[in-house]
């Protein structure tokens, strides 16, 4: 079945520029460290991780007609992702994402230049309507415009749509369309922003999940940091999945790997609780790698990690 099935990912593609400090950062000063340029973008990262997990992943995104754009498409295609339907915008710069990480791997601040994502319009998507509607699952990220997200949700037909909120700032684009979303993967802040309910701890998650389901969301996968992941189905299934002990090197891309894991498990028909645990394994592998996308990601490696992992609670 998987040979015929494919996943369509609609979202951002950009060049990641990451600065790693060797020591604790001294602000307003030059810090010794390492600077790396790697392919990135939420949608593109999800697509690459899906390809690593053995899926046919088709990326619909936009890049500029510059060196970085061509390099991005070439590297993404070499990673196993189909990029034939990506849009090349003449005269525009390819998106870039600049992040600064401390010596523990924690991201301190980031700046993004993603104006080209506005080129992912309803008109562009409509050119690929039939292809999108034949996908096994659609994954969209909130870097694209509200108009584009609305088109996806209105035209998905019977294809489930998984949405990555990206940030508290951008997730509001889908607040009024939760009933059209199959699976949403917010973190604590994004869930608070959408629901208007404070998440002070584990005791509040059921209330937040109930709010999402009352507004029509089918499945909620809520990342609660050190408390683990809370998952909830509109049918009533819910539970906690404990955090996996991980040697954190780079937090960039961990959420993208998790979304890829969830989508991959949907393609394979895996039960919800097992899907969440597998997705956590994908995230753990991303966290433990210096690159945004761990090249060692595979179904076998994730299963091995999950089966042998030490839980934190």
Predicted regions and their residues:
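Glycine-rich phosphate/adenosyl-contacting loop at the front of the ribokinase-like
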Residues: 1-74, 78-81, 247-248, 313
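Conserved phosphate-binding/catalytic region of the ribokinase-like
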Residues: 2-9, 31, 170-171, 175, ...
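Short beta-strand scaffold segments in enzyme catalytic cores
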Residues: 96-100, 109, 228-232
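A glycine-rich helix N-cap at a beta->alpha junction
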Residues: 78-91
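Conserved beta-alpha-beta core of the PfkB/ribokinase-like small-molecule kinase fold
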Residues: 137-207, 227-228
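Conserved phosphate-binding/catalytic loop of the ribokinase/pfkB sugar-kinase fold
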Residues: 88-89, 99-137
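Short, conserved phosphate/pyrophosphate- and ester-handling motifs at nucleotide-, phospho-/glycolipid
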Residues: 50, 187, 255
């Amino acid at each position: 079945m998987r040979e015929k099935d494919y996943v369509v990912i609609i979202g951002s593609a950009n060049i990641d520029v990451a600065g790693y400090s060797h020591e604790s950062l001294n602000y307003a000063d030059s810090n010794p460290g390492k600077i790396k340029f790697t392919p990135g973008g939420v949608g593109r990262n999800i697509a690459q991780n899906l390809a690593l997990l053995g899926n046919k992943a088709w990326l619909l995104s936009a890049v500029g007609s510059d060196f970085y754009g061509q390099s991005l498409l070439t590297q993404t295609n070499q990673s196993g992702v189909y990029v034939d339907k990506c849009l090349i915008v003449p005269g525009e710069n390819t998106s870039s994402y600049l992040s600064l990480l401390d010596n523990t791997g924690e991201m301190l601040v980031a700046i993004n230049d993603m104006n080209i994502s506005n080129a992912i319009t309803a008109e562009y998507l409509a050119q690929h309507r039939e292809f999108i509607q034949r996908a096994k699952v659609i994954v969209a990220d909130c870097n694209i415009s509200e108009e584009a997200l609305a088109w996806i949700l209105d035209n998905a037909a019977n294809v489930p749509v998984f949405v990555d909120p990206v940030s508290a700032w951008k997730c509001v684009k889908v607040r009024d369309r939760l009933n059209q979303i199959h699976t949403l993967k917010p973190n604590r802040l994004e869930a608070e922003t959408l629901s208007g309910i404070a998440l002070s701890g584990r005791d509040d998650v059921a209330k937040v999940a109930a709010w999402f389901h009352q507004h029509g969301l089918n499945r909620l996968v809520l990342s609660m940091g050190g408390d683990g992941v809370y998952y909830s189905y509109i049918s009533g299934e819910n539970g906690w999945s404990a955090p996996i002990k991980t040697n954190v090197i780079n937090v960039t891309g961990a959420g993208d790997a998790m979304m890829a894991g969830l989508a991959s498990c949907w393609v394979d028909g895996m039960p919800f609780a097992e899907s969440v645990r597998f997705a956590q394994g994908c995230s753990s592998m991303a966290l433990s790698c210096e690159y945004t996308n761990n090249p060692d990601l595979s179904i076998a490696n994730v299963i091995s990690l999950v089966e042998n992992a030490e839980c934190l609670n």
